[in-house]
Amino acid sequence: SKMDSSVRLLVLINPNNPCGSVAGAEEIEQLLSIARKWPNCMIVADEIYDGLDFTGTQRSVASLSTDVPVFTLNGVSKVYYAPGWRIGYLAIHDPTHRMLNVRDGIERMLRARLCASTPAQFGYLAGLESDRSWMLGYSEKVIRQRDVCIKRISQIEGLEVQSSGGAFYMFVRLTDAKWAEDDKQFVLDLLHEEHVLVVHGSGFSPKLGK
């Protein structure tokens, strides 16, 4: 209902940060059908958590699009657990060549030659081309940690949480009226009293994040 000709892009983070939800093929097709109605609209697909999909339903948006331009973002910081390498990439999928001007603008920016170190780039290439079965062990570890967190949080009165389908996040709802009144203060109290650091939900959405 909020779509009109002024909208230039739709953003999908899949698996999602901060909720940990995963959009499957059906949801992605719905998003594509919305973008398809507006010729000047493209999709930016942040898929940096694609290797941490616990549902088996995550799909690349570009692989499902036959006409809508999709700019896919990915990198090493999440799935490869190497944030210090500072390596990411953008893959452009533009079947009908509608975003040539945007692509040209990006290529002009690349000429500034600001990039990650060459050894790190070759290291990432080796990671992409070699056996990645080791990732399964890391994924299983994250799942075990998720399950422990869900079990413990569900035992605390005043907190609610849904099981995350991917990434390493969960969005905990404050159901206690006192806590929910000021989630920033809750975060500070939790840090000072229990030495546990979390992020306040209202930072993502003042209205929906509490």
Give a label for each model feature.
Residues 1-6, 18-43, 47-85, 95-98:
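Active-site pre-lysine segment of PLP-dependent enzymes
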Residues 11-12, 43-45, 198-200:
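Hydrophobic residues in well-ordered beta-strands that form the structural core
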Residues 52, 163-172, 189-210:
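Conserved PLP cofactor-binding pocket of PLP-dependent enzymes
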Residues 66-143, 150-152:
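Conserved core segment of the aminotransferase class I/II
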Residues 186:
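Short active-site alpha-helical segment characteristic of glycosyltransferases
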Residues 10, 17, 46, 70, ...:
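Generic structural signal for small/hydrophobic residues in well-ordered secondary structure
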Residues 121, 125, 140-150, 161-175, ...:
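Conserved glycine-rich beta-strand-loop-beta hairpin in the small C-terminal domain of fold type I
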Residues 1-5, 108, 158, 198, ...:
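Short, intrinsically disordered, charge-balanced linker/junction segments flanking boundaries
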